[in-house]
């Protein structure tokens, strides 16, 4: 049996991504890897506590809220620049809050921004690639291949990491990763991006990667390139050792019904 951790989510495990909750990620990993076991324990939890658990992805939640309160989210989902994105995000949040004053505003903002920011980044990835090719006069190779490698094996499971790269500069043997910023360019590599780029370098056995951050304003796209070199010490101490520690705790959880129910109690409360 294999357990695969995505490169884009590995930093949640290592603690370098402070924006996403570890318990929520564990719940997601459990559901993805052991769906029948997850549903069985969710039913046990529901019966024990006499509650109905309604599980929704952020996308499903936003769609439900928009339909319930008759709020059009299409303009936001089709935003071509960051100013339009932010303006329409605020409009959606305000309209939903007006119609449902008791709604948790923090959770609403998180839901709207997570869905629409991710959508914006995905839709503008090709534009960023074209801009980069024009600026550098290169033709970056792209692929839809999912790369994965086994990291270690425990008594019960094979642990793997995997992911898809945005592009590869074949002339310079360098991985290219695009990040579409929403508010500003950072001009530095953030911690969770270091974990992600290191993972891609490990998967493809490359020593160099390049994070290209872009900010799309009306009529203009700003771009900054951050060079990232392979760091074996960082990989071993900050990623592999922390992943091994996580694997031990996750496997303990998977081996105990009592721990699973306690975890659901803590996470779903």
Task: For each feature predicted by the language model, list its residue ranges.
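Nucleic-acid nuclease catalytic cores
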Residues: 118, 135-259, 263
């Amino acid at each position: 049996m294999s357990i695969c951790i995505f490169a884009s989510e590995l930093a949640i495990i290592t603690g370098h991504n402070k924006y996403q909750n570890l318990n929520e990620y564990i719940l997601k990993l459990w559901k993805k890897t052991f769906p029948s076991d997850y549903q069985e324990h969710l039913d046990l939890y529901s019966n024990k506590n006499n509650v109905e658990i309604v599980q929704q992805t952020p996308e499903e939640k936003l769609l439900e809220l928009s339909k319930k309160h008759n709020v059009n989210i299409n303009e936001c989902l089709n935003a071509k620049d960051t100013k339009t994105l932010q303006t329409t995000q605020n409009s959606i949040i305000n309209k939903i809050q007006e119609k449902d004053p008791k709604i948790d505003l923090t959770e609403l903002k998180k839901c709207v921004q997570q869905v629409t920011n991710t959508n914006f980044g995905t839709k503008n990835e090709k534009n960023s690639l074209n801009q980069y090719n024009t600026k550098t006069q290169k033709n970056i190779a792209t692929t839809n291949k999912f790369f994965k490698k086994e990291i270690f094996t425990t008594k019960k499971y094979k642990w793997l990491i995997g992911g898809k790269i945005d592009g590869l500069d074949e002339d310079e043997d360098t991985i290219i990763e695009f990040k579409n910023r929403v508010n500003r360019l950072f001009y530095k590599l953030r911690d969770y991006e270091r974990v992600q780029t290191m993972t891609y370098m490990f998967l493809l056995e490359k020593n160099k990667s390049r994070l290209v951050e872009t900010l799309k304003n009306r009529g203009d796209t700003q771009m900054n390139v951050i060079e990232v070199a392979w760091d074996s010490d960082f990989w071993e101490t900050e990623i592999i050792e922390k992943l091994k520690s996580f694997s031990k705790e996750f496997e303990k959880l998977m081996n105990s019904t009592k721990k699973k129910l306690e975890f659901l109690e803590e996470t779903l409360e």
